[in-house]
Amino acid sequence: MKIAILGTSGSGKSTLAKRLGERYGLPVLHMDTVHFLPGWVERPFEEEETIIRRFLDENAGGWVIDGNYTKTCYARRLEEADKIIVLWFSPLVCLWRAVRRWQQNKGRVRESSAPGCEEKIDAEFVRWILHDGRTKQKWAQMERIGEKYPENYILIRNQRELEGFLKEL
């Protein structure tokens, strides 16, 4: 099984990826671990693309990948995915979760972050959560994915829907 998890920052993509990876015994790739170098420096695109392509090739039998990053093997990830899960929670819920995550991981690097990228929350990230990361264009992109892959597409808009989805596994 191949599962792509997309959605807004703070919606729980990495947590869900870890759970599904454990549930199905699949390797998990958190896109943030590839996109960033230590200190939240963006990795050169060619390197990032090579790492993702290698992961997909080496795990042809199944995987869980969380993260959007539409320039990095995006079409391939969606084409190959048996399930495309989109987490699109309210902005305030996502902000609350991001703040809680920061409080729990302050000064540490999360498993779903790149080495050397300590958990942080700053004005730029808050703006991303509340506005820039959830524009009408980004939502339209998620809707187009649902139209293109209706049999594989799962939209989850709140915690209750997420819990219902998890119970059905």
Where are these regions (language model features)?
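Glycine-rich phosphate-binding loop used to anchor ATP phosphates in small-molecule kinases
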Residues: 50-95
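Conserved lysine of the Walker
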Residues: 13
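Walker A (P-loop) ATP-phosphate-binding motif of ABC ATPase nucleotide-binding domains
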Residues: 2
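Hydrophobic anchor at the beta1->P-loop junction of P-loop NTPases
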Residues: 5
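A glycine- and Lys/Arg-enriched "phosphate-lid" helix/loop adjacent to the NTP-binding pocket
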Residues: 89-137
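NTP-dependent small-molecule kinase module
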Residues: 23, 127-169
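The conserved Walker
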Residues: 9
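Conserved substrate/cofactor phosphate-moiety recognition/catalytic segment
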Residues: 18-62
